[in-house]
Amino acid sequence: MLRWLTAGESHGPELIAVLEGLPAGVPVSPDAIRADLARRKLGYGRGSRMKFEQDALEVSGGVRHGLSLGSPVALRIGNSEWPKWVDLMSPEPIAAEKLAGARGAPLTRPRPGHADLAGMQKYGFDEARPVLERASARETAARVALGAVARSFLGELGITLVSHTLSIGPVRVPEDAVWPTPADVAALDADPLRCFDRATSARMVAEVDAAHKDGDTLGGVIEVLAYGLPPGLGSYVHWDRRLDAQLAAALMGIQAIKGVEVGDGFLTATRRGSEAHDELVAEDGAIVRQSGRAGGTEGGMSTGGVLRVRAGMKPIATVPRALRTIDVATSEAAPAHHQRSDVCAVPAAGVVAEAMVALVLANAVLEKFGGDSIGETARNLRGYLDAISQNLATERVSAPYA
């Protein structure tokens, strides 16, 4: 079983991430993790923080000479901006005069759409700073780092992932657009909005420009695809063991995500049954699904087809034009607190979603096949696939459906 935890605040000295349960012998490359951390900063419409904030990665446990040891993997991501926040975020008590000034002023105007007000109510804070520091999407850097390790584990078993942007605001790729594959990651990362359709990407850029001009923000939809999965990950026997339920929970746990669908999801709900499911045919001695409408899961289990999950991100709640709120120190109406923010962070959300899907799939693989070393896990996987009787055999799909 794979377990992961993160710790740290947005403007604290560092983020800490721990991954427990990873088998020994998995390649763990600090450079590969840094590359994913850089991908998390991609996207047209990002704020100034992405330009000056550096992620100083350090692998502090669980890895020796580039390979996992089977013990917990510990990662640290230093915050290059920490010197500016030493007093405000100090773990030690600080004299009031050291907190004087704009940066140290209490944040008593909770921002609509953020965790501010509910967090203040829940934890008994009289200002929003303690809430927003942990609720911030900065925390996702730690999960992206862990996801890079999980993806390396999956890659050793022939499982690969890719994410891309389906929509920004009202601008959406056509429903019949070609699915990207992991071979397209470089091209996607080079696109301003990580969109696989160039014409749609250009219209997305224009939409971001318009929102920026209006002092507004945008959300959108991203999609993660996983290729090469074996059938049978997850289970139908209990609700919490269903793979699609675990994926939905992981994606909903990403900041600003408000909806998740698997495969064609809500579109499937508009179809008749004769047009909603993936028919089975025999080809070259194997059972083949003619389409991928279900998104690679049936009955809470992977089918061996392409896994396809989507997540809808709401527009960023820190709106430059400032939404209305109440100053809880005076009980009077006031504009919400505004700090530098993005116009659109949907492309980055795709990278975070990719990491979360990788972690969930890695856990599902270990739950099914176990193994204290990557070699043992791989042997168990091969033995399982070999044991499936010939009349039930399906192919592990490593390319989009025709």
UniProtKB/Swiss-Prot annotation:
Which positions does UniProt annotate for FMN binding?
Answer: 134-136, 255-256, 299, 314-318, 340
Named in its record, the pathway it takes part in is: Metabolic intermediate biosynthesis; chorismate biosynthesis; chorismate from D-erythrose 4-phosphate and phosphoenolpyruvate: step 7/7
Which GO MF terms are attached to this record? chorismate synthase activity; FMN binding
Please provide the Gene Ontology terms (biological process) for this protein. amino acid biosynthetic process; aromatic amino acid family biosynthetic process; chorismate biosynthetic process
What the protein does comes down to: This reaction introduces a second double bond into the aromatic ring system.
> Is Amino-acid biosynthesis a UniProt keyword of this protein?
yes
The record's remark on the cofactor is: Reduced FMN (FMNH(2)).
Organism in which the protein naturally occurs: Leifsonia xyli subsp. xyli (strain CTCB07)
Q: Name the PANTHER family on file.
A: CHORISMATE SYNTHASE (PTHR21085:SF0)
Q: Which UniProt keyword terms apply here?
A: Amino-acid biosynthesis, Aromatic amino acid biosynthesis, FAD, Flavoprotein, FMN, Lyase, NADP
In its UniProt entry, what is this protein called? Chorismate synthase
Listed disulfide bonds for this chain?
A: none
Q: Which InterPro entries match?
A: Chorismate_synth (IPR000453), Chorismate_synth_AroC_sf (IPR035904), Chorismate_synthase_CS (IPR020541)
* Gene responsible for this protein: aroC
Record's Gene3D superfamilies?
Answer: Chorismate synthase AroC (3.60.150.10)
One of this protein's Pfam families, by short name?
Answer: Chorismate_synt
Q: Which family does it belong to?
A: Belongs to the chorismate synthase family.
Binding of NADP(+): at which residues?
A: 40, 46
Transmembrane stretches in the record are none
In the Enzyme Commission scheme, what number(s) does this protein have?
4.2.3.5
Q: Reaction(s) catalyzed by this protein?
A: 5-O-(1-carboxyvinyl)-3-phosphoshikimate = chorismate + phosphate
One Gene Ontology term, aspect cellular component: cytosol
Cofactors: FMNH2
User: How is the quaternary structure described?
Assistant: Homotetramer.
